[in-house]
Amino acid sequence: WMEPAVFAVVLPELFTPENAPRFEAARAIIDTLPEGLPEVSARLAALLLPLGEQGTRKALKQLRCSNALIEEVTTLVREAGLVPEEKTAARAIQARRLLGRLEPDPLRRLLALCAAHRPEQAAAFAALQTAAGRLQAENACCRVGQLAVNGRDLMALGAKPGPGLRGQLEALLEAVITGQLPNERKALLAAVKIELDP
């Protein structure tokens, strides 16, 4: 570890009177996270968490980090307040929604960060990671692009192009994620027909 005095020069935002006490807590969290270059984003997120999303983005820009690293770290900071669902069905829905927003590796890093930050919930975050892994293995539908229908299919039924079309696809995705509809072309098109011709 660098000495706090060095960190204070490199990242002065961390050593304001309100943030300085959080530095030692951040060090303890970072020490529990996996090591290695692929994991640097989770470790940076743990360090910069007290700065919030905008402060993290600003600090990383000052350090001249790559845009990809800045985006991942700020996403991890933004999502770090995640509360894991306890019930199996709710956990599966939560895992699908997370996979809809995050790629698998950033999601794994987020869950590791959350477990390190809140060790009393580590088992719940591990269960959420297991649920996400199972969904990936099943190639479950978690994003609009994974739906069995697309915008052209909806327009063929009479849907108008534009933002409303995207909204219809997102509504179908939500129905699939929550188990109201299967991700099957026939069932999805039938639901759209009902919506277009009430």
Residue ranges and their predicted role:
Residues 1-123:
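Conserved, hydrophobic alpha-helical core segments of structured domains
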